[in-house]
Amino acid sequence: MDLKLPIRSTVYHTEKTLQRLRFFSQPANLPILLGISFPKSGTHLLDQILLGFSKVAPYARRVHSFYAEYEGESGVKRVPEQALRWLDSLRPRDVASAHLFARPEAVARVCSPKFVPYFIFRDPRDVVVSHVFYVTEMEARHVHHAYYASLPDFETRLRVSILGRADPSTGSGQARFEFPNIAARFAPYLNWLNQPEVLTIHFEDLIQDRVRTLNRILDHFLARVPLPTPRSRILDCLEASINPSKSPTFRSGKTGEWKKYFTAEHKTIFKEVAGDLLLKLGYEKDNNW
């Protein structure tokens, strides 16, 4: 048994109790703050911002838990019921984070009074570049690390991140994991864009237009959780909560870096498999890029 788990749980709930005492005049049944993200799209940045609300309301001071649709080390895809059990395990005033598919059952839960949900995503071209660096250099336990490390160069790895990887099979012929092309990887998240209860955030807006984007995040929160605290004070808390040095997977936080790494071939294959995705997400108006 991992002794760290019960210790972390005890610390978490103790801090939540202290937060409740600190903000005793505010309701105890405030909705859960849920940050949904596409992988490599600013997960920890959004986590930090949402935790900034703990300075002005009785929210937890750390993320309750993180859920991902795939197990990082094995690459095994979790069954839909696991996501629902995780969502049901969350309690009022929690702050939680997830790479969560927009399946109908999950959407029904998240788009309910129980949650204040946010969805952050990033230019998929930057995502595939970030993915190469992360898998190759930052996470040796990742299911794809050994394979990426075996490839001859960055260009080849980037090609795999765009096109995906054929499923290696077990002795029984069953695929061990799935890693389709970038458009297919994003497809299960697309329905979050259609939910008015979910605030969608371009990662780039938090880098290039942070003040306006933090105001949008705050407005979405205040629509459900009215606070007596001055708006300027809340915004200062959200801004102060951002600390890239505390992100375990932070690399550069820059936008448009794909332009430094994409060759003509990368552009061609990306347009073939994910050109429409860029249009849907608002990153391009056509394929002439």
Where do the PLM segments sit?
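PAPS-dependent sulfotransferase catalytic domain
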Residues: 2-154, 164-201, 265-268, 272-276, ...
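The conserved 3'-phosphoadenosine-5'-phosphosulfate
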Residues: 59-78, 194-264, 268, 272
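Short coil/turn segments at secondary-structure boundaries
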Residues: 250-254, 284-289
